[in-house]
Amino acid sequence: MRHQKKGRKLNRTASHRKALMSNLASSLVIHKKIQTTEAKSKELRGFVERLVTYAKRDDVHGRRLIQKRILGKRSKEIANILIHDIAPIYKNRNGGYTRLIKLDNRKNDNAPVSLIEFVDIAPLVIEEAAEDASDKDSGVKD
């Protein structure tokens, strides 16, 4: 029986699950929102919220815990983004840093898909994109 077993297996080996969570978390930190299957996004939510909590500590141990969970060459870059860009936004919030939005099922295999995004960051990203677009439009051509 599977009583009191935490987490989802996602039909993967332990090392593959670890790599999957690391890659999904990296993508979420860089892009601020990603679209994935519902089971993966539900599992990712706890993983990323733990990383943001580590980043809010703003100490060496928190940075090392983040780098331990984010695999690959970009772990330092992801840790810097979390600590300097994302954590200050959530300094007064105790959890609930991400939001899941259920979307339509995927067309080819009918898998349930959802969008996972940071709660207070999504409007900021849209405003920055609008400012960048207006800067490009007002630029002088050679």
Roles of regions detected by a PLM:
Residues M1-A19, N23-D142:
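Structured, basic alpha/beta domains of bacterial-type, RNA-associated proteins
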